[in-house]
Amino acid sequence: MNKNIKYSQNFLTSEKVLNQIIKQLNLKETDTVYEIGTGKGHLTTKLAKISKQVTSIELDSHLFNLSSEKLKLNTRVTLIHQDILQFQFPNKQRYKIVGSIPYHLSTQIIKKVVFESHASDIYLIVEEGFYKRTLDIHRTLGLLLHTQVSIQQLLKLPAECFHPKPKVNSVLIKLTRHTTDVPDKYWKLYTYFVSKWVNREYRQLFTKNQFHQAMKHAKVNNLSTVTYEQVLSIFNSYLLFNGRK
């Protein structure tokens, strides 16, 4: 088995917990599902029972061979031996994504599924602290994700639910796609704005007078309690001051 910590995995083995997760997914028999990490096929098997088709992507050769043998007679399951970060999700097909992602790749994978897929709903099992970071609009990741998806916790999963037992608790979260808050034509400007904003490099974005106007328009009294909506307002002021709107 691949022992590389970059791809280390902690497996859900409790039938009770797996069933609790399935209940939260709200999948229909017409749904197409892409699963990140087949593992030993426990969740894959349950996904296939309640959806139309499951495509499960697994990098680890040992786990891929193990799950291939276990699921070889299941006509609803297609297994792919590939790194999820290299996988190309379909552009036109309707689908949902489910996965328990390695802690060490959480940021890369969540960016992948949000910005490089068209999934309507994304269900991920992640480390609890990472989930909190996705909600933090004082961080780059939070400000980028919120433009495309809303994020909510569905289920708390204590470390005891996994084998081997990790040092941290996990949560099942749902990312629901919404109409983008930042049109494609402004995306590069937004990522630049965010990189400067989170590092408080305000002088790189505004003159002193512009900054004062942007804060006033967004009704910001305290930068430490600024909301996502206020950041969007400030970004729109940035576009206006730079003749982009």
Swiss-Prot record:
Top class in the EC scheme: transferase
Keyword entries, A-Z: Antibiotic resistance, Methyltransferase, Plasmid, RNA-binding, S-adenosyl-L-methionine, Transferase
Residues reported in the UniProt entry to bind S-adenosyl-L-methionine: 10, 12, 37, 58, 83, 100
GO cellular component: cytosol
Gene3D superfamilies found in the cross-reference section: Ribosomal RNA adenine dimethylase-like, domain 2 (1.10.8.100), Vaccinia Virus protein VP39 (3.40.50.150)
Ligase in keyword set: no
SUPFAM superfamilies from the UniProt entry: S-adenosyl-L-methionine-dependent methyltransferases
BP term (GO), one: response to antibiotic
The reaction(s) this protein catalyses: adenosine(2085) in 23S rRNA + 2 S-adenosyl-L-methionine = N(6)-dimethyladenosine(2085) in 23S rRNA + 2 S-adenosyl-L-homocysteine + 2 H(+)
Signal peptide feature range: none
UniProt KW RNA-binding keyword: yes
E.C. numbers: 2.1.1.184
Pfam families: RrnaAD
One of the record's GO molecular function terms: rRNA (adenine-N6,N6-)-dimethyltransferase activity
CDD domains: AdoMet_MTases
General function of this protein: This protein produces a dimethylation of the adenine residue at position 2085 in 23S rRNA, resulting in reduced affinity between ribosomes and macrolide-lincosamide-streptogramin B antibiotics.
Family statement drawn from the similarity comment of this UniProt entry: Belongs to the class I-like SAM-binding methyltransferase superfamily. rRNA adenine N(6)-methyltransferase family.
Full protein name: rRNA adenine N-6-methyltransferase
Organism: Enterococcus faecalis
Lineage: Bacteria, Bacillati, Bacillota, Bacilli, Lactobacillales
Gene name of the record: ermBP
